[in-house]
């Protein structure tokens, strides 16, 4: 179980020496990455398996963490690749694709994936065969064969398949020997024993900021979708986290002071009278209790850059 953070310590360090605070938090995160990579390398050899499955709910930082683990593996002599399960989305079909209660394409369901193709690729990789990894274009809602890529695994190579459904039975049961990782922002923030900032709020801030920065989606729309995202987590993601060989906490102690400025700016666009204002009544006062840390202290390889931009990794 992860340890909570404490807002009085966070605020004291945010004001006193933000550069040192940020550096220490990033060092702790990178140490966890290195330890995870060492365990993955050891277990993959022991299991004689080349596949790692990395799952976690929205806003967990799966993409950056997977790439940082790959880098750490390479530093200890193991060549690694990352593949997003988003590439395996099937072209929507109103007759067969899962829908939300509102009749929209349910992107939180594992049945959005081309499971037959994905599981076929698992077995092909086990046999040492080449596969062509597809690409799904979310803008056109269709598979784009021009962006497909070949994947071949050598004897000392690993591939990390990362996505919200990587540990779901529909995926993981087809590859029982795979090493399994579950990642999420798992630390609450407390004030003298009282919960003052929930771990799910940390992920919501990440999602709101990322959606506005990278996808042009306003906070009101992200908040509208959040209920369906959370329902999808409870149905399709969280029940499978205890399959994981490692539970990885992606939260950082200095994170909320950094994200605060971006989130407040995004929340300003939620109009008065919007139903989404209800969801902000508890979150906004809690957020305002934090001091600020300038984003200039966030290094380019930080997981936070997945959400605020300016990072070195592709997302």
Positions of PLM-derived features:
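Conserved lysine of the Walker
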Residues: 62
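Hydrophobic positions on the alpha1 helix immediately C-terminal to the Walker A/P-loop
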Residues: 65-69
């Amino acid at each position: 179980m992860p340890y909570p953070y404490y807002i009085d310590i966070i605020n004291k360090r945010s004001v006193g020496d933000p550069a040192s605070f940020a550096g220490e938090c990033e060092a702790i995160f990178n140490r966890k990455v290195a330890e995870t990579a060492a365990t993955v390398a050891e277990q993959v050899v022991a299991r004689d398996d080349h596949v790692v499955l990395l799952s976690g709910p929205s806003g967990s930082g799966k993409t950056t963490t997977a790439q940082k683990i790959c880098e750490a593996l390479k530093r200890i002599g193991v060549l690694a690749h990352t593949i997003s399960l988003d590439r395996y989305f099937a072209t929507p079909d109103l007759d067969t694709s899962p829908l939300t209660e509102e009749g929209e394409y349910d992107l939180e369901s594992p049945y959005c994936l081309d499971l037959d193709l994905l599981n076929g690729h698992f077995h092909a990789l086990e046999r040492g065969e080449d596969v062509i990894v597809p690409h799904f274009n979310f803008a056109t809602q269709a598979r784009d064969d021009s962006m497909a890529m070949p994947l071949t695994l050598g004897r000392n190579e690993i591939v990390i398949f990362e996505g919200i459904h990587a540990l779901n039975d529909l995926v993981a049961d087809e590859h029982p020997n795979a090493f399994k990782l579950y990642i999420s922002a798992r630390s609450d923030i407390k004030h003298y024993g009282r919960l003052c900032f929930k771990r799910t709020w940390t992920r919501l801030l990440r999602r709101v900021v990322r959606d506005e920065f990278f996808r042009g989606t306003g906070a009101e729309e992200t908040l509208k979708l959040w209920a369906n995202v959370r329902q999808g987590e409870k149905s399709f993601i969280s029940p499978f986290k205890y399959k994981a060989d490692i539970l990885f906490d992606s939260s950082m102690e200095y994170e909320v002071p950094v994200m605060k400025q971006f989130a407040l700016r995004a929340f300003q666009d939620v109009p008065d009278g919007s139903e989404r204002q209800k969801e902000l009544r508890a979150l906004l006062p809690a957020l305002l209790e934090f001091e600020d840390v300038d984003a200039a202290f966030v290094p380019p390889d930080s997981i936070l850059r997945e959400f605020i931009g300016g990072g070195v990794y592709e997302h």
